[in-house]
């Protein structure tokens, strides 16, 4: 892996980005730079791509096996689930409710490929990974005979067709919070377009506009149309605290992602996987308390179980018990109440002062592409940039 700079800006870059719905390309970072640039990319070898793909498939399979065992045992210790959340998890698993996608975040230093977390419920940067970076590869000068680990779009089409055939339904609703911003809604718009091309009748609405008809005992949209299939770019742990959450198990709406994904999107997964697969080459040691940390490893990352966008991340020095806020992490009491997990600190490589992480996508059960985000700090947060990639066949 290497960072390559100096690519020319397409003369019509802005129009090309807008053509594919990427109207948030110019989200500003603190230094004034934009979320997207044509001028930078990461280059990989075919062997590196094969390794990332194989690792993603392996870890996804491990996570599914883990979820099955946790639900069978009813072992929800350390997750801080409510009784309703436990019920939703078990009901959705028992009903074999379908799932769509997820994104593994990896650290890679050229030798070690390590899982940081699994964004199994509400991952974003999907439009960027599936469409925008592929458009860049096709249009940028000087990259003939290069390829990209990316058939995300094709897998999404296939999976939406599968969902239609499996469910026997015709209408698909997609939602996010009304004020979620263009990044979230851009991802929802993209998935709506994919679903439409897979044969679904599409309806979009804000999460706040989801209603419940007490006579039909179904969730409905603003037109009182039953919501049978619902993609929601809104965390399950938040949705389960909504007033209508008590009706989820009886309303016959299929939520995507399903409630059992709460087991995988919660960072308790990191410690649980390490206990289940100790010394796995692609996992980092992780524990729930500082008292469990091995003495031979001094530096740890303290992560909130339900944090997002690098929020509320601390560094913890085992040798002296000192804890301090990680540079680049925004801190809020909102995320600190969920509990924490301690994960061994992994030294990300710095390229021109930027720290990249790999986001490897799973659609259904297929690893099918990746995108990279880089930031000025080792914690990837709201200042990050999305960077395209390519490999040399």
From Swiss-Prot:
Keywords tagged on the record: ATP-binding, Ligase, Magnesium, Metal-binding, Nucleotide-binding
Keyword Transcription regulation among record annotations: no
Signal peptide stretch: none
Sites marked Transition state stabilizer: 103
GO MF entry, a single one: ATP binding
Binding of Mg(2+) 1, residues: 105, 117
Enzyme class: ligase
Binding site for ATP: 103-105, 267, 303, 310, 343, 378-380
EC number(s) reported in the record: 6.3.1.-
Positions contributing to Mg(2+) 2 binding: 119
Top-level taxon of the source organism: Bacteria
Keyword Iron-sulfur listed: no
SUPFAM superfamilies, alphabetized: Glutathione synthetase ATP-binding domain-like, PreATP-grasp domain
Free-text function comment from the UniProt entry: May be a ligase forming an amide bond. Shows ATPase activity.
Family: Belongs to the glutathionylspermidine synthase preATP-grasp family.
Annotated protein name in UniProt: Putative acid--amine ligase HI_0929
Taxonomic source organism: Haemophilus influenzae (strain ATCC 51907 / DSM 11121 / KW20 / Rd)
